[in-house]
Structure formats: C-alpha cells, structure tokens
Amino acid sequence: MVDAKQVRFIIGVIGNVISFGLFAAPAKTFWRIFKKKSVEEFSYVPYVATVMNCMLWVFYGLPVVHKDSILVSTINGVGLVIELFYVGVYLMYCGHKKNHRRNILGFLALEVILVVAIILITLFALKGDFVKQTFVGVICDVFNIAMYGAPSLAIIKVVKTKSVEYMPFLLSLVCFVNAGIWTTYSLIFKIDYYVLASNGIGTFLALSQLIVYFMYYKSTPKEKTVKPSEVEISATERV
C-alpha cells in the first residue's frame, strides 16, 4: 500500500519534470542568440535573477535546512546549471554591450556573496530546524513570489490593449500546473509552509493570467505574433 510519503515523492518527481520543462523553455531564445552571435534586445535580468532563486532553493532543500525536501534541491540544482549556461552564452555574445557584461558579473558576484552569507548565518548562528527553515524559507519565498509576480504584470498590458499578444497561453498554463503540483507536494506527509506559500500564490497568479487570457483572447488581432523579447520573461517561474 502506498503511504503519504511515497505519494509526496511521486508528486515531487512529477514537479521536477515540469519544472525542468520551464527551465528549458528559453533554449529557443539562446539558440537564436547563438546563431546570430548577438543578444539583440534580449534581457539578461530573468536569467541572473533565476540563478539566485535556484541557489537559495538548493540550499533550502538540503538536509541541513529541511530533511524532507531533497527533490526541491535536485530540480533547482539542475536549473542552476541550465541558467548558468544561459548566462554564459549571453556573456559570449553581448560584446557590443560592454556594460551588460560588467553588470552581469557584478550581479552574479553579489548573489554569491549573499548566498554564502545566508549559508554561514544558517549553519553557525541559528539553532534548531524550525529556526533554520524559517530564515531560509522566508528569503526563498520573497524571491520566488517576485519571480511568479513579474510575468503577471503583463495582465496590465492585456487589459489596456485588450490583446493577449504578450501573454503566451502555453507558458501561463504550464506555470499554473507547475505551481499547482508543488503546492500539492507541500501539503502531503509533512506540510512545507514555505514551498506552500510561494507556490500557492504562484498558482493564484498563474490562474489569474489564464482567466485574463480567455477574457481577451477573442479581441486579439489574429495577424499579430508574440515578440520573443516579451515572451522570455514568462519562462522564469520555478519552485
């Protein structure tokens, strides 16, 4: 008979697969950058921000912080490698934008310093699992909610233009499923309030995007196409 812990593990594996799909979504953008040998007008911000988010969740899922969330660490570890690859490609082909290279390296250095500081505080200044989980979990939630919320800003543009041109349906749907899976994962066996908080809010935000999409879908001119530079930001939502 399957117990709650096994069910949680299975759902976590499903969440890993879906999250991997989200991490891989910008691959088309970077293939375009590689072929054109130029970053054009694509922004580096989503990928640099996701590096920070992944590092934090990798640490949160380790046994030193949370003993039952190793699947959170595994997918974010994979995501970290993918995002660093994206950033590396961006650095290779942003030669005509020297300030971008300087900014990226500066932000990455700052992120590493912050994560190292969080790790040191957690390991040497905090006592007890609850205190450690609360400290790291709250920080993770702040970053995760911000990343879930950023694509939802497109709702404002949709309402103003009465067009869903800049709100890709498939990404919104996958983000909704992803957040929903991780919300379910957080509720089974042992409630993980920090995975629950950010992904619960993420589920609501993604659902809001889908509702707005269906409200304005018919009023969108069919001949218009989605611009890659607008779509890329929507692929940054993870655990």
Curated annotation (Swiss-Prot):
Residue ranges annotated as Cytoplasmic topological domain: 28-44, 91-103, 157-168, 216-239
UniProt keyword Transport present: yes
Membrane topology, as annotated: Multi-pass membrane protein
Gene ablation phenotype (knockout): Dramatically reduced fertility due to a postmeiotic rupture of microspores.
Extracellular side: 1-6, 66-69, 125-135, 190-194
Tissue: Expressed in inflorescences, embryo sacs and pollen, and at a lower level in stems. Barely detected in roots, leaves and seedlings.
Keywords, sorted A to Z: Cell membrane, Membrane, Repeat, Sugar transport, Transmembrane, Transmembrane helix, Transport
Biological processes annotated in GO: callose deposition in cell wall; pollen development; pollen exine formation; pollen wall assembly; protein homooligomerization
Induction: Induced by the pathogenic bacteria P.syringae pv. tomato.
Localization: Cell membrane
Pfam families assigned to the protein according to its UniProt record, in alphabetical order: MtN3_slv (PF03083)
Entry keyword DNA-binding: no
MtN3/slv domain mapped to chain residues: 9-98, 134-185
A cellular component annotation (GO) from this entry: plasma membrane
Major location (coarse): membrane
GO-annotated molecular function: sugar transmembrane transporter activity
Membrane-spanning ranges: 7-27, 45-65, 70-90, 104-124, 136-156, 169-189, 195-215
Family, similarity comment: Belongs to the SWEET sugar transporter family.
Subunit-structure text: Forms homooligomers and heterooligomers with SWEET4, SWEET5, SWEET6, SWEET7, SWEET9, SWEET10, SWEET11, SWEET13, SWEET15, SWEET16 and SWEET17.
Function: Mediates both low-affinity uptake and efflux of sugar across the plasma membrane. Required, in pollen, for microspore cell integrity and primexine pattern formation.
Protein name per UniProt: Bidirectional sugar transporter SWEET8
Species of origin: Arabidopsis thaliana
Gene: SWEET8
